[in-house]
A protein has these predicted regions:
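Short, surface-exposed, polar/charged, turn-prone segments marking secondary-structure boundaries
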Residues: 28-33, 55-58, 113-114, 136, ...
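Short charge-dense sequence patches
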Residues: 1-13, 50-58, 84-88, 114-127
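Short alpha-helices
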Residues: 32-106
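Hydrophobic helix-and-loop "lid/oligomerization" segment in the mid-to-C-terminal part
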Residues: 83, 88-166
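A generic "cationic amphipathic patch" detector
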Residues: 14-15, 70, 118, 131
Length: 166
């Protein structure tokens, strides 16, 4: 199995973790978080000085023999997915942005990725239930500790009530 953006099996969820651990298939990790669970994987691509796992994956894919730096050899869906992942992990370039992040965005746009369309799909197309959920969470579920930490709990009953979809 390939584990992307998941520095340890425990981050994969209680149902998936035992399956991943018991799998006899080679295990590959591609991640940008600190302290990956290296011993559980046969191959580890780990770099913390990148914006996202998508940025690290972009670097890996560009060096593959069938690509050799030529993004035109990749399907547009792949390029769009890489741009989408990098955009969401950086909160639209608001955090964890490095020079390589901007280079990646530039290369993807030069290869034909329509960043404006991706932004529109990510940030301007909400179902009514999603807006209602956001309002509910802010109004009824937002907790702020005395230290100033804010959090919300989105349990299964709330997910069901608002037809939550990822």
């Amino acid at each position: 199995p390939f584990c992307l953006d998941c520095s340890s099996f425990s981050r994969s969820g209680e149902d998936m973790e035992p399956e991943l651990r018991s799998s006899s298939a080679p295990k590959v990790l591609v991640d940008h978080h600190l302290n990956p669970e290296r011993d559980s994987f046969g191959v580890v691509f780990s770099e913390t000085e990148v914006s996202s796992t998508c940025e690290l994956l972009f670097r890996i894919i560009k060096e593959m023999p069938d690509v050799e730096g030529d993004l035109a050899r990749l399907p547009m869906e792949c390029l769009e997915s890489l741009m989408t992942g990098m955009t969401t992990d950086t909160n639209n370039f608001a955090n964890s942005v490095f020079p390589g992040t901007l280079n990646m965005a530039s290369e993807l746009m030069a290869a034909g990725v329509d960043r404006d369309r991706i932004l529109s799909c990510l940030y301007h197309n909400y179902r009514e239930n999603r807006l209602r959920l956001m309002g509910y969470l802010l109004d009824r579920n937002l907790e702020i500790t005395p230290e100033g930490t804010a959090f919300m709990i989105l349990d299964r009953s709330i997910q069901k009530r608002f037809d939550f979809r990822q």
